[in-house]
Amino acid sequence: MISRLDVLPLSGARTEVRQKVPAGSCPMSAPSKIGCGALAAGAVLAGGTVPANAAALQGLVLPWPWVLPFLGLLLSIAVGPLLAPKFWHAHYGKIVFMWSALTVTPLAALHGIATALAALAHAALGEYLSFIIVLTTLYVVAGGILVMGSLRGTPLVNAAILAFGTAIASIVGTTGAAMILIRPLLRANSARLHNVHVVVFFIFLVANIGGALSPLGDPPLFVGFLHGISFFWNATHLWRQTALTAALVLAAFIAVDIWYYRQDRRVAVVGETPRNEPIVVRGMINLLLIVLIVGVILLSALWKSGVGFDIYGTTLELQDVVRDIALVAIAVASLVFTPDEHREGNGFTWEPILEVAKLFAGIFICIIPVTAMLHAGHAGPFSWVLPLMTDETGAPRDAAYFWLTGTLSAVLDNAPNYLVFFELAGGDAATLMGELAPTLTAIAMGAVFMGALTYIGNAPNFMIYAIATERGVKMPSFFGYMIWSGAVLLPVFAIVTYVFLIRPLP
């Protein structure tokens, strides 16, 4: 799911990946926490070190009602804009705060203030801070790249943009690729009557599927990289699955876009850019800054400083602090050195990133007990799921790993989910890259591919939604999007399951 950052491959959230998670404890799954920032700050002022009674949140003692605030928030996101759009857009921050409070208050009352503050400090300082810094930096830098010229939203042009974005997503990350290309794509299709499907397929391909080939592509794979999976392992083991998935989805897009394009041509189109206008890219310095962002994130993972700062039980490692400072500096540099007219030409505003920040904060506050319950494994409330993962001989069912990892990644943060199933499969990188390579492949596919099933499955999904909505595209509701994703992606995933997991090719 959404998001989420786990150290982040330019696409999502940052999850605790530098230490193994003991069964029954919660490292605080995901990146999110705007609302928890204040509590975390209070925790820092309160002492800076964790008191003896601040035990880790034990998922095995949490009953199922702890899931309700998370489900309530998801339902609010799903139906709020649909049933009461004006009220939702005016008060969604308050609604997010309400559900977050319904998670945090019982947590403090039943498990102790110290435990709650330690958990929130970890979430805010160890997860959300890096998450929002990376997303904001990419949003700012990509917003300074202005593509001008006769870029018309024909099926050929649209397919080319989607294919290009899919190809570069594993290099600059799904968030990076999405933020670079979404505005030119919207501008190219602004005169078309039917353009919603273009954005929906853009989310499928560029914001998710394209990131499956490197740790820089999507947060779950970066988590695997930090746990010992070699940098090029995903490229060598997932290229066929990614190629087939992307090809099938792109073929579906071309068919749909041709059909809608023919409908649009029956109506006079106004406001098109003249065909003889050359394509010009302005703000080229921001392309260099994108490369610099990738380098900073990669180097932060490779550099082991051995220096850390303990803040109320959350260790901030020096390389992570340096990375975040460098990313903020890059964002500032983009704002300073990019002419204002470039962002004005892109229709750049701060509202989309603010909306993402608030919603993701609430999601990951509410997800705290859910993730703890998942980490409890066989002793936890979700123990009934685990027998589905192995056959009668104890061998892993790769198809089950794919679908369960993917289903949870569609509604939870995909990076923590990757880590949960990574540990469930043994947690040993050498074994998973060797004899259990098909299982690791299934986990990676599920975490990356199925993040496209919902708006909250991966961080860039909702950013794209927010940008498109602000630009006047009538994006489908939460459930409306799931109808699109279910109709297009589920059959594709079924084919991929049969070809690679049930009847694997040699």
Task: Give the role of each language-model region.
Residues 50-54, 85-86, 105-124, 128, ...:
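Transmembrane alpha-helix boundary signature
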Residues 213-214, 223, 232-281, 449-506:
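Juxtamembrane and boundary regions of transmembrane helices in multi-pass small-molecule transporters
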Residues 290-420:
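Transmembrane helical segments that form the transport core of multi-pass membrane transport proteins
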Residues 66-74, 91-108, 128-137, 282-292, ...:
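Hydrophobic mid-bilayer segments of alpha-helices in multi-pass membrane transport proteins
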Residues 1-11, 17, 21-54:
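N-terminal secretory/membrane targeting signals
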Residues 55-66, 87-94, 117-129, 232-241, ...:
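Interfacial loop-to-helix junctions that mark the boundaries of transmembrane helices
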Residues 72-84, 141, 176, 180, ...:
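Juxtamembrane interface elements at the cytosolic ends of transmembrane helices
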Residues 106-108, 169, 180-194, 198-199, ...:
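Membrane-interfacial helix-loop connectors
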